[in-house]
């Protein structure tokens, strides 16, 4: 399949020059009745407040960063882009209401977001009914993207990442046998846990698990219970503030145990929240390597605007805008419609900041994973992609 040069790549460096977008200042394409090129409006769903606000702000900046770059180069086939971002507060019900608002607005050509798999799954019926793409930077539930041809995600799936955690981090890298798991009581965390347990059983791991409700602050009873089984590792499956709270409360109780988490990625906010950040290990499908000039420049540019270092999440948000732009480029001089964007998006092959972005028939991305940890209050790669090269 034909690949297209990326305007994002051109803005960054020649290292990403094969990928997302070409012909950005072309004069062909759909026009308004007045003969002028229409502005393509996108709807953004992001948790700008609440437990996931760090990620929501990252979405907001990543979306706008890409749009500003595209528009500065004349748009795509002359079409400029704009985005309206709604605060979903990390709540699936709020997200569904806002997705409906976007879907009912005929000027909105595609929806970018939401952050959680639960919210994206709740919106799947809505986007399917209205025939509008919902492209999530981060939804990782294995059953999300195949809910509708209009559902897409680029984060990767928990039926790959969670088994990687069991086999490569716990069994192979740490040599652990007895595992304590504390997880959020949510659809996303249940998917993580179920896929983790399937591989953990194959690896012969002895797992004890407990869950907690959203908004829980006091984890002392769970920590006491888990400590009593004398595990080798404490694993937390969550993406919000509870990750730091659980590990910090374990530290405060005097529990000296290896910390592992599935969900937060390489979050700078998490490092700042933890009392013993150097004791944490996570999985990640992407890392901002300081030795990679292209990625380093992107990260520095993001940090200047955001005030914090980026994780994969805002980079995926940035890539999502370019994926839509690439779809518009592929439509060429045809009419820009929701269905045309869906079809072009499904058929495209791309290279973004976060790597290869080639959709499976289900509408998600196959990712590889690495092991990351903290040294001297900075994230580092402990084992690269090759660590799981033999597969699960």
List each model region and its residues.
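Short, low-complexity disordered leader/linker segments with a strong preference
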Residues: 1-41, 72, 387-392
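Beta-alpha junction/loop-to-helix N-cap segments that form part of ligand/metal-binding clefts
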Residues: 28-31, 54-59, 73-144, 154, ...
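Extracytoplasmic "Venus flytrap"
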Residues: 35-36, 40-64, 86-93, 115-116, ...
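Extracellular/periplasmic Venus flytrap/periplasmic-binding protein
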Residues: 97, 141-143, 149-254, 288-289, ...
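Periplasmic-binding protein-like
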Residues: 102, 106-115, 135-137, 178-183, ...
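Extracellular/periplasmic periplasmic-binding protein-like sensory domains
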Residues: 247-318, 373, 385-390
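Segments of small-molecule ligand-sensing domains
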Residues: 304-314, 325-379
């Amino acid at each position: 399949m034909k690949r297209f040069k990326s305007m994002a790549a051109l803005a960054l460096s020649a290292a990403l020059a094969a990928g997302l977008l070409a012909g950005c200042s072309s004069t062909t394409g759909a026009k308004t009745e007045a003969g002028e090129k229409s502005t393509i409006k996108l709807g953004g769903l992001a948790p700008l407040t609440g437990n996931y606000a760090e990620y929501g702000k990252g979405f907001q900046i990543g979306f706008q960063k890409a749009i500003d770059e595209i528009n500065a180069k004349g748009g795509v086939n002359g079409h400029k882009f704009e985005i309206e971002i709604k605060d979903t507060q990390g709540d699936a019900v709020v997200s569904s209401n806002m997705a409906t608002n976007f879907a009912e607005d005929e000027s909105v050509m595609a929806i970018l977001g939401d952050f959680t798999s639960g919210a994206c799954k709740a919106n799947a019926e809505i986007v399917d009914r209205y025939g509008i793409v919902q492209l999530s930077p981060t939804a990782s539930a294995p059953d999300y993207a195949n809910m509708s041809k209009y559902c897409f995600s680029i984060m990767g799936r928990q039926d790959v990442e969670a088994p990687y955690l069991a086999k490569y981090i716990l069994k192979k890298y740490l040599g652990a046998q007895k595992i304590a798991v504390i997880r959020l009581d949510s659809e996303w965390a249940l998917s993580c846990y179920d896929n983790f347990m399937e591989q953990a059983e194959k690896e012969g791991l002895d797992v004890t698990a407990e869950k907690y409700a959203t908004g829980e602050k006091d984890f002392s009873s769970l920590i006491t219970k888990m400590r009593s089984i004398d595990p080798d590792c404490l694993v937390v499956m969550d993406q919000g503030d509870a990750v730091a709270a659980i590990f910090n409360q374990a530290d405060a109780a005097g529990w000296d145990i290896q910390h592992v988490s599935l969900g937060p990625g390489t979050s700078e906010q998490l490092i700042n929240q933890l009392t013993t950040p150097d004791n944490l290990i996570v999985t990640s499908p992407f890392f901002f390597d300081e030795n990679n000039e292209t990625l380093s420049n992107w990260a520095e540019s993001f940090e200047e605007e955001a005030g914090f270092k980026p994780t994969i999440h805002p980079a995926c948000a940035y890539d999502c805008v370019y994926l839509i732009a690439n779809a518009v480029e592929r439509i060429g001089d045809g009419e820009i419609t929701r269905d045309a964007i869906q079809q072009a998006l499904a058929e495209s092959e791309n290279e973004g900041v976060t790597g290869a972005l080639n959709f499976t028939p289900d509408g998600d991305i196959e990712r590889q994973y690495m092991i990351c940890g903290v040294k001297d209050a900075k994230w580092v790669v402990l084992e690269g992609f090759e660590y799981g090269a033999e597969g699960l």
